[in-house]
Amino acid sequence: GLESTIAAAGLMSRAVYPKLLENKDISFFKDNISYLFYFGIFSTSLVIIFANPGLFALNPSFVIATPIVVLLAIEGFLVVLINVFQQSLTGIEKVDTIDNSTAKDYLKSNLFHVHTMRLIQTVVYVVILVIGLILLISVNTSEIDLLMYWASVLLITQIPLVIYLSLKVTKHFKFPFDIKRILVFLIASIVMSISTTLLLDRFLIYSENIYYFLPNLLIFIMFSVGMYLMLTYVADSKIRQLFKLIVQEIIKKT
């Protein structure tokens, strides 16, 4: 599904939490965050680009929900960031390892702050959603507009939490965001998105014959993936090193 596609970008960060708990050198964290953005921006862009044809493949009548999928794609990426930031902040917290820690110590710790902020975000989301749905339903709002409202609230209420956790991570990890690399990934994604969208509009024929439509769609997906990988390979030396390591591992296993 949509969430699993984007959430896969956060799998590489699973090792962050145990490493931080072991009190190892945290210098690895900056590269880890960069790779998170590398795959996160890529997977989110793919979902956005192919939302319309993907929904058409499921059912042509689903195309009307394309804007909703776009909002959920962005929200899914923010959730990945939130989860990684939360694990990182709680991973470096040592208050629970100190025998004489007091309740006041816990209240000052990341263990309390991070989870409390996430709880507040959830409560705010539910309250705004319920109030809005009651008002919209009372004026006979269409189902698609109700879904659009839900997706919008879901996305907007994640943004303050992402900002808060980003500031906390910046404070504890001495600004782990490699802006230059992240901008490279973003620019590569924009170039890929514009190029693919133009080609889709020009050449993709929307046929209800799924055996004709899907193979054609797959060609455009392969083009998008290839373009992003090529652009980032050329522009980023660490991505080139990552590719070499992946190839070496594949050769070893074969």
Predicted regions and their residues:
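Alpha-helical transmembrane segments of polytopic membrane transporters and translocases
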Residues: G1-A9, Y35-Y38, V70-F77
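Helix-loop junctions and terminal segments of transmembrane helices
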Residues: L2-I26, K30-I33, Q86-V95
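Hydrophobic transmembrane alpha-helices of multi-pass small-molecule transporters
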Residues: S4-A7, T44, V80, T122, ...
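Interfacial transmembrane-helix starts/ends
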Residues: V16-Y17, L21-F50, T66-V69, K104-H115, ...
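Interfacial segments at transmembrane-helix termini and the short loops linking adjacent helices
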Residues: V47-V80, V95-D96, N100-Y106, I137-M148
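Membrane-interface helix-loop junctions in multi-pass transport and translocation proteins
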Residues: T66, S101-P160, L198-M222, F243
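Membrane-interface junctions at transmembrane-helix termini in multi-pass inner-membrane proteins
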Residues: I74-V123, L165-K171
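Membrane-proximal transmembrane or re-entrant/amphipathic helices at the cytosolic face
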Residues: L167, F173, F177-R181, T197-T254
